[in-house]
């Protein structure tokens, strides 16, 4: 009887652990999901304030993904997303970094203890690694393969700043990268953050609605 109980206990433990893992990960790409990303960022924020460490948020969006799906089919689209996720995951793998599928064809990365120059280096490695996959994309006339655009916001958190404000900055950077030709990186500076929180900075994404 004891052996059966022990076997059942191990099975129950493994099932609980598996369910916990599934609750934290995106089922398609294997990256963390949006809920985990948001929760991680909220925990990381006060830690960065206390330790006076920089934080960077990167929003990474697959260019012309709708046209890719339309041309190659949803199964190929899913495979492309998995390959993109695998390519960029390597560059946000430190203990306090996190990469998540943030929705659709968009990924988000939070990097701890980095400045703007370091964040841009990571973003460029991500952008280049996806391009080097050389996934054919006839809908991308300029490049002929699957590419990503990246918006970067790198700041030193303080108590008068919010996580949402920095996410908005990264989103605006992503919008500018799309606007300026895609397959590129755009960053938002500290000064632009100040303009955002004072209402001077206008978010063009509110007008854009949906990216491609």
Predicted regions and their residues:
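Juxtamembrane or sensor-core-proximal signal-transducing alpha helices
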Residues: 1-20
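A short pre-motif secondary-structure segment
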Residues: 98-101
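Short regulatory alpha-helical coupling segments
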Residues: 20-21, 34-54, 85-94, 112
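Conserved nucleotide-binding and Mg2+-coordinating catalytic segments in signaling enzymes
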Residues: 20-39, 60-74, 82
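Alpha-helical scaffold within the catalytic cores of cyclic-nucleotide enzymes
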Residues: 85-89, 118-138, 169-171
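Cell-envelope/extracellular polymer assembly enzymes that use nucleotide-activated donors
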Residues: 56, 149
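Catalytic-core segments of nucleotide cyclases and related cyclic-nucleotide turnover enzymes
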Residues: 112, 116-124, 141, 155-211
